A protein has these predicted regions:
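Extracytoplasmic metal-acquisition and chelation regions
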Residues: 2-17, 22-330
Length: 330
């Protein structure tokens, strides 16, 4: 009897030990699985919302695989007219960061004010915005065209500055540095990568700026006509002069007086091309060009980008080629 009890005790002990080992193995497996999930979660890219394409471009180049960047302005849409759905506002509030230009899009300004994520990057502090009046052409007339109610609203939104800084790659370089520093602060574990990529992007933008300046240094003509005056920063950088059919806001309609001034300038200066834009109706420009016996071509302000095969730098190079052809550059 004692032997039987002794054997049973050993049997119970063995079963108990086996169970303990099994539980330990399960616990270890669960712990490993939990650690793997935690590691995978920590490796997930940071969600970043950019207000429009040029800022999306910079942020993606700087963040690389560490970020998942989405533009609040849909591809092919006019950013001046942006309205945000409740879903987009919610996505913004849940993002790791937002990159925007304060004063350019009132819907974004309001969303950031009311639903800001932890990291807010306002590039207006680094890109040296210029007073709008400095980028008005010499042809601006008193009535500045017949503006729609919507155009007046946009004019109020933009305030007294020209928002189109991204058409000067040197200013894009400054924005790259700011974005890199902000992302590094938001994600310290990858700070070195952000700063390295920002420095590389800055160098690329500075090289592009030099290419624009050198490529337009020897041109027969120095004036170019555009649909609206979005190219002031590019003109400043290259020493050229833009003459816009309408002002900074694309919704303003050129007055008869403005069109006459453009016509007179084209004849007097030997201008051969009126530039249109992808996102604006070319009707007025094409009609005027036909009346004057000259051509039209596209000069892209890169406010939005629907063609995934071309990025900011590629479009800027196309803009340079278009200018060189229109201005008879060497």
């Amino acid at each position: 009897m004692i032997i039987m009890i002794f054997s049973r005790s050993h049997t119970v002990f063995a079963i108990t030990a086996a169970a303990a080992l099994a539980l330990s193995a399960c616990s270890s497996s669960a712990s490993s699985s939990s650690s793997a999930s935690s590691s995978q979660a920590s490796a997930s890219p940071m969600k970043v919302m950019a207000s429009f394409y040029p800022l999306q471009y910079l942020t993606q180049k700087i963040g690389g695989d560490l970020v998942d960047v989405e533009s609040l302005t849909p591809p092919g849409a006019e950013p001046h007219d942006l309205e945000l759905s409740n879903q987009k506002v919610q996505q913004l509030s849940q993002a790791g960061a937002v990159v925007y230009l304060k004063g350019f899009q009132s819907a974004v300004d309001k969303a950031v004010e009311l639903n800001a994520p932890k990291t807010v990057i306002d590039v207006s502090s680094s890109v040296d915005l210029v007073d709008a009046e400095k980028h008005e052409s010499e042809l601006d007339v008193a009535d500045d065209g017949e503006k729609t109610e919507e155009a007046h609203e946009h004019e109020h939104e933009h305030g007294s500055t020209d928002p189109h800084f991204w058409l000067d790659p040197t200013r894009m370089a400054s924005a790259a540095t700011q974005i890199g520093d902000a992302l590094a602060q938001a994600d310290p574990a990858n700070a070195e990568t952000y700063k390295k990529n920002a420095a590389s992007t800055k160098s690329q933008m500075e090289a592009l700026s030099k290419k624009l300046v050198d490529g337009t240094a020897k041109c027969k003509h120095k004036e170019f006509v555009t649909s609206h005056e979005a190219f002031g920063y590019l003109a400043d950088r290259t020493g050229l002069t833009q003459l816009g059919l309408s002002g900074l806001d694309p919704d303003s309609t050129p007055s008869p007086a403005r069109l006459k001034q453009i016509s007179d300038a084209v004849k007097a200066k030997g201008i051969t091309t009126i530039f249109t834009e992808e996102l604006l109706s070319p009707k007025v420009a094409e009609t005027l060009a036909k009346d004057l016996g000259i051509t039209t071509a596209v000069l892209d302000p890169i406010e939005s980008q629907a063609d995934d095969s071309k990025d900011y730098e590629a479009v800027m190079n196309e803009n340079l080629e278009a200018l060189q052809k229109a201005l008879s550059c060497e």
